[in-house]
Amino acid sequence: MHIILIHGSWHGAWCWYKVLPHLRAAGHTLHVPDLPAHGRDWRFVRGRLGLTAMTRPLCRMLDQLSEPAMIVAHSRGGIIASQLAELRPDKIHSCVYLAAYMLRNGERVADYFRKDKSSLVRKHIQIQRSSLTDSLPEHVQRETLYADCDEADVELARSLLSAEPSLPAL
């Protein structure tokens, strides 16, 4: 089966590195893209990315596959998964939302985010209005994102995290 892994906020394709060998060993064909302005894809660096720009490369990827794919999305990647399911329903076998946003029609992440009063991300997120990006300060990343990770994985992630384009969430 084709599986497309969609990373969440501030991350890139790199965040799946521990999962990939297990899925390949199970015989799956994996597609692990960096979303625009994430990971190694720095074509857009100022955050002016809407949902269309974020989903377009994945639509092209789905269009090239010979069979429907499973989508596995983490965190804010759930927004992308839902949009793909609407745009290419015949190309998607199933969607797995792994601690991901699955919003109601018309709901925005910002709306959902305001309701989640206990969220550590909500408490610590820093929004850079000039670049339309958001990020988390390094001193709260372990507590907020990596509480169950070993120190080596935390350091790896810290070295690879990037600012998140905020526009798709607004």
Which positions does each model-derived feature cover?
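Glycine-rich His-Gly loop
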Residues: 6-9, 74-75, 100
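Active-site loop/oxyanion-hole signature of alpha/beta-hydrolase fold enzymes
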Residues: 29-31, 35-70, 86-87, 110-114
